[in-house]
Amino acid sequence: MTHPGSEIKLILLDFDGTLADTRRANTLAYVATLREAGYTLTEEEYAARYFGMRCDEFLTRIGIADPAERERLRLRTSALYPTFFDTVRLNRPLWDFCRQFRAQGGRVWIVSTGSRANIDNAMRHLGIAGPQAVRRLETPDEDTSRKGERLPEENAVDGILSGADVACSKPAPDCFLEAMRREGCTPRETLIFEDSEIGLEAARRSGASYFRVKL
């Protein structure tokens, strides 16, 4: 999907599976958390059916109806996630492309269904975020005062929108449209990079141009 003659001013990046290969780390964290709680989930099942979903939706789909239990499991998963960072890899070609784009005056945002704490911690591990873009590695819970913030110039991206920042997650296009609104850009001026089917559907519905990433 392209918009001939338009100038791209804004790049929106999904994080998990697009900017960083976090599939195995996410999978292992969920499997370990659920095993502790007495639930059975294989790595293969999570990777094939649930990767890319917002945590609360995923836990609901596997039959965990109690909101308090879902929140407890979410926090435990976030706490375990950094222990699997040895499996996380940066998509270096895409990252270098975005750095060049920013150097020429473009804007780059991360737009993800993941939690802000998980994104910050993974970026810190990969060495691609300035000091004001990340929190302490040991802090797994959401800091609502930083929801959808624009970041200072010394940071590696211009803004981050995480799963908690919009009411409707992907495949709804709300997260992408909100990032465009905050930057004052139209869909014709925006390019999206995504990997998952739900992310690609959100990109299509946003009206922007998009690329599918395969890691």
Q: What is each PLM-predicted segment?
A:
Residues 2-48, 205:
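Active-site neighborhood of HAD-like aspartate-dependent phosphohydrolases
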Residues 4-6, 103-106, 183-189:
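Glycine-rich phosphate-binding loop signature in dinucleotide/nucleotide-binding domains
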Residues 18, 112-114:
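Conserved phosphate-coupling serine/threonine residues in phosphotransfer and NTP-handling enzymes
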Residues 25, 50, 54, 76, ...:
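Short beta->alpha linker loops
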Residues 28, 36-66, 80:
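Alpha-helical substrate-recognition element adjacent to the catalytic core
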Residues 95, 196-199, 210, 214-215:
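Short glycine/proline-centered loop/turn elements that form peptide/ligand docking sites
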Residues 115-191, 197-205:
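Substrate-recognition "cap/lid" segment bordering the active-site pocket of phosphatases
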